[in-house]
Amino acid sequence: MASGLAEESELSPGESELAVNPFDGLPFSSCYYELLEQRRALPIWAARFLFLEHLESSPTGVVLVSGDPGSGKSTQIPQWCAEFALARGFQTGQVTVTQPYPLAAMSLASRVADEMDLTLGHEIGYSIPQEDCTGPNTMLRFCWDRLFLQEVASTRGPGAWSVLILDEAQERSVASDLLQGLLRDTRLRNLPGDPRVVVVTDPALEPKFQAFWGNSPIVRVPREPGGDPTLAYKDTVPTDLVEAACQAVLELCQQEEAPGDVLVYLPSEEEISLCCESLSGEMGTLAVPGPPPRVLPLHPGCAQAIQTVYEDTDVSVRKIVVTHWLADFSFSLPSIQHVIDSGLELRSVYNPRIRAESQVLRPISKCQAEARLLRAKGFPPGSCLRLYSKSTLELEAPPLPHPKVCEENLSSLVLLLMRKQIAEPGECHFLDRPAPEALMRALEDLDYLAALNDDGELSDLGVILSEFPLPPELAKALLASCEFNCVDEMLTLAAMLTAAPGFTRPPLSAGEAALRRALEHADGDHSSLIQVYEAFVQSGADEAWCQARGLNWESLCQARKLRAELVELMQRIELPLSQPAFGSEQNRRDLQKALLSGYFLKVARDTDGTGNYLLLTHKHVAQLSPYCSYRNRRTPAQPPTWVLYHSFSISKDNCLCIVSEIQPEMLVELAPPYFLSNLPPSESRDLLNQLREGTAEPPAAATETSSPQEYGDGCVLQ
């Protein structure tokens, strides 16, 4: 495709001073031409016309693009697709780019808006959780892939698409893998506009995607010219990775012959924070010429602060960027000259057999190691220090990243598949098929939640559950709150449970600990979360107020946005709201009932009175989290006998997280009878069955009627 539009973008200021931007009709700014020179220097620029030809003529409507990190794929391909759509007048809709991480979608939208000389939030936009920066004239949108999948499966969405770009497909996110499966299935290739599809990946996964997509054309981005980085290994893995990484950074900073920015890879956010804190303390006293280096974290918790990584500073100020797997393929930083790679990642892996997640510290893949090495490739080539041995990489590292669809709870995935009217989740094409046990467990959980009817199809309740950007059990609890007249409190709780953790981890000062303790509620962790949120709102969302109590201000702001989004969704699907009643005895019981309606699968009983909890659904013993409000009270008290928990971790702490006391009579009342019958043999099951047999009449608490609703009408979940 050699359109006039494509030729226009080759112009320089000297060639046409009157050139106008075809997307908004305004003259190009001088900044546009400066960025155009940088774009032309990217390795992918050489493949531009080949890509446009394949996009025009692909027999399958699909184009594969394979290239190294930093080659310009994520910024240039969306612009070329926008040119393609503009040449057709955007007759079939906008261009949408999916990203595996919300922060990447936001960051790329900002960069592409600058390069195209357009306005962010107008022609160029992004959609991430709790933030929709788009407008009616948005023609190029960057979107978190899970949010886009939710749009495709539900009644929401912008309408139609000219081109759909699945970027960073090698990350193997659940949403990206499922979108490819749905798009490959010709029965489901009925998205509005019948969009062209572009799948962008790393060369290591090119054969896998090529086999999956058949005879679709592929565009291979040439590797950036220049020497390879100097590569060094450690003979053994250090016992303290943070200390070893800090030491390596300090040594680099003291070498005059090693200028340039540094990228440090550590396993987890906790280690990133420790490393940044340690390095920041050292930099002020470091004997180096010029200003001290600037230490910057890069992880999902950074939120809007992520853009500071890209801010132009004095070239004499060295940047030390400390990150983890987030920057394996995303967030290319051209100024990086040196990489320090720990070779490890901390990931959450779901075990469907016991419905629990574990934090697994494991070696990165060979593909990730190569991507990290290439971050230091350039003019002149930099260096890469691997804090592990070459034999460790060769013998212990898997060749490719682990597909997330084989490691996550699949309940939400199966719910979406059912929404797309796939009779059996097993019928969907997967790049890597999940274990049958994981799919069956997801179906079982959805059946317990009444999301499926007697024929195994999605029930009316299941359709409503699929509309919510929440895990199915939390969505069910929110719907149940309509019946129990505690919607206001449950909306707050759903937002707090979904947003990033609102508490900073100890150690806290004595003053911070005392102020935080004052926010704890006697009814348990769930009520404490509601109390924290309400106090935060009453403070005027004051950041200093949060810091004084060891609270994460950005997480609480995120929860506030999510709550507003949930309120809007409840109103759109005409579900009733309720007036606030938090703190009353009736509201306490109603909130417990709503929670149990969704979380009856997550109940445990203290079997010996010492805090050893036996999980109801399987014979596994756990303890309360060290951060649980029941353990942090000034006056020691006997732990509650029966508890409902939000999550269970079988990692090093083996604990129940976010816990509240419940009454077993309430569990018998609200859990499906066949669920109680299917519990494994235990004393807890016997006690519940005795309660069920001895309560032909509802218990006293259950016979009490809620006060009449003052706002909206109630609903009853069948």
Swiss-Prot record:
<keyword id="KW-0539">Nucleus</keyword>
<dbReference type="InterPro" id="IPR014001">
    <property type="entry name" value="Helicase_ATP-bd"/>
</dbReference>
<dbReference type="InterPro" id="IPR048333">
    <property type="entry name" value="HA2_WH"/>
</dbReference>
<dbReference type="Pfam" id="PF21010">
    <property type="entry name" value="HA2_C"/>
</dbReference>
<feature type="short sequence motif" description="DEAQ box">
    <location>
        <begin position="167"/>
        <end position="170"/>
    </location>
</feature>
<dbReference type="InterPro" id="IPR027417">
    <property type="entry name" value="P-loop_NTPase"/>
</dbReference>
<keyword id="KW-0067">ATP-binding</keyword>
<dbReference type="GO" id="GO:0016887">
    <property type="term" value="F:ATP hydrolysis activity"/>
</dbReference>
<feature type="binding site">
    <location>
        <begin position="67"/>
        <end position="74"/>
    </location>
    <ligand>
        <name>ATP</name>
    </ligand>
</feature>
<feature type="compositionally biased region" description="Low complexity">
    <location>
        <begin position="696"/>
        <end position="708"/>
    </location>
</feature>
<feature type="region of interest" description="Disordered">
    <location>
        <begin position="690"/>
        <end position="718"/>
    </location>
</feature>
<dbReference type="Pfam" id="PF04408">
    <property type="entry name" value="HA2_N"/>
</dbReference>
<dbReference type="GO" id="GO:0004386">
    <property type="term" value="F:helicase activity"/>
</dbReference>
<dbReference type="InterPro" id="IPR011709">
    <property type="entry name" value="DEAD-box_helicase_OB_fold"/>
</dbReference>
<protein>
    <recommendedName>
        <fullName>ATP-dependent RNA helicase homolog DQX1</fullName>
    </recommendedName>
</protein>
<feature type="domain" description="Helicase ATP-binding">
    <location>
        <begin position="54"/>
        <end position="222"/>
    </location>
</feature>
<comment type="function">
    <text>Might be involved in RNA metabolism; it is missing helicase motif III and may not have helicase activity.</text>
</comment>
<dbReference type="GO" id="GO:0005524">
    <property type="term" value="F:ATP binding"/>
</dbReference>
<keyword id="KW-0547">Nucleotide-binding</keyword>
<dbReference type="GO" id="GO:0005634">
    <property type="term" value="C:nucleus"/>
</dbReference>
<dbReference type="Pfam" id="PF07717">
    <property type="entry name" value="OB_NTP_bind"/>
</dbReference>
<dbReference type="InterPro" id="IPR007502">
    <property type="entry name" value="Helicase-assoc_dom"/>
</dbReference>
<feature type="domain" description="Helicase C-terminal">
    <location>
        <begin position="245"/>
        <end position="447"/>
    </location>
</feature>
